Amino acid sequence: MKFFLDTADLDEIEEAASWGVLAGVTTNPTLYARTGGKLDDFHNHIKRICEIVDGPVSAESVAMTRDEIIRDGRELAALADNVVVKIPTMVEGLAATKALSEEGIPVNMTLCFSVPQAIMAARAGARYISPFVGRFDDIAEDGISQLADVVAAVNNYDFGHDVEIIAASVRLSLIHISEPTRHAQIS
């Protein structure tokens, strides 16, 4: 089990890194804006995170078309060796994931809400897939069961590359703190 922090706050990242348990970070421009950061400085902020964190740093592209996502993904990946390009699980994102993964750029497909989406993400070349556990619960689904289904389905296939599941959007309840560790590789 690995623990990733979902934040753009450098103080939080440094604190968690000092505990010796932080395996990686996931972040996006919205989280960065909450720290007072400006979108045009997002890439520099990712560099600073990568200087703190040895493990993967998933940085989300805000581009919406295949070509824009690929361009942004290449720019993000060039920032540091441990950058993982975070891309929404949508048609344009799947196409961009295929292209980037063929270039050796690791991708985290985020906003995954179903087993078929997870399978498509893995087939497109995603290294990480992020099902949104808490958001399943928000729509009256059992998020932990959905997570278990995604993990079981992905583990059922050989995609020709490693795929890890990140339990994303985990809410602060006892069940959501303990249960993802039974299913996902990363929480």
Label the predicted regions.
Residues N108, V115-S178:
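Catalytic alpha/beta core domains of metabolic enzymes, predominantly
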Residues M1-F3, V21, N82-V84, I105-V107, ...:
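Short active-site oxyanion
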Residues I175-H176, H183-S187:
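Single conserved hydrophobic/aromatic residue that forms the stacking wall/gate
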Residues D6-D9, A63-D67, I87-V91, M109-V115, ...:
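Glycine-rich beta-to-alpha transition loops that act as phosphate-gripper elements at the mouths
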Residues D81, V85-I129:
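Hydrophobic, well-structured mid-protein blocks that either form specific transmembrane helices
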Residues F4-L5, D9-I13, W19-L22, T27-A99:
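Active-site beta->alpha loop and helix N-cap motifs at the rims of alpha/beta catalytic domains
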Residues A17-S18, A77, A122, S178:
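Non-catalytic positions within long, well-ordered alpha-helices that form the structural scaffold/packing
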Residues C50, A77, L94-G104, A148-F159:
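Surface-exposed amphipathic alpha-helices with a cationic face
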